[in-house]
Amino acid sequence: MGMSKAERIAALLGSLKKENKFEQIANVIDKVSIKESDQIREIVPIEEWINSEYYCGADGVKKLYPFWKDLICDIFRDGKQNYNQIVLTGGIGTGKSTCGLYIVLRKLYELSCYKNVAGLFGLMSNTMTAFLYFSLTKYQAERSGFAQLRSIIDGIPYFKERFQRNKYRNSTLDFPENIRLFYGSSTADMIGMNVISAIIDEANFFGDSSGSEVDLGSVEELYNSVLSRTSSRFTSNGVNNSLNLVISSSTFKTSLTSKLYDKSLTDPSIRYARARLWDIKPQGTYKNEYFY
């Protein structure tokens, strides 16, 4: 049995030093306000989860290519999250954006198996845990990846029966435990938020193949801000629990994806995956064809 709240307060007050007592008392109040988290459901192993219509929906099981399923299993293998940064790149039609959404869904699912999610990370119980989907404009985000994410969630039995969102709001996805999914277009949309996970789909920031409509450096600046915020909020006991994704088409050669590729060669926290159509499509799709 652990100590009662009164016993915890007494023990903490008894440890105070004479100097800076008011500051120390404020710290005591913060500590007793942080409740521990309890696991309320067993977390289904990733290999079972990704092939279950109950957890991923019929579309996830039947339409997510094996290439991406294998990647998702690698990210969450052995019952833990093995990377903090995921870079998905490849040609149009390879399913990389959809894969990114299912990676985020796995993170959401794992959090849903706990009571007092904030306590997992040493945060106060009323702390909001936020996910963000970024696009060039909020309007574009709402009608692209965020809308797809909402549609996927609404078709999954688990999120209908065990962890249901507020169906009266579609501009954000509000779940129990003060977990919320937002969309945004700039660093300003993160102000005041405890962001645990974000997706930046680079293709949404470009008007054409040259990327001339937006300063490509601003995308890198946004991503660096995301990394800083997520790691500072959700690093607990030396473990970084954040999960951030960059999704980029092979059409675009950007400094961000190039830098992340170079970093991935030596940084074990980054997973870089490049999909080619002949890797993705079912065997026989390109029979007797050659690629140069």
Regions inferred by a protein language model and the residue ranges of each:
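Phosphate/NTP-binding elements of NTP-utilizing enzymes
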Residues: 1-292
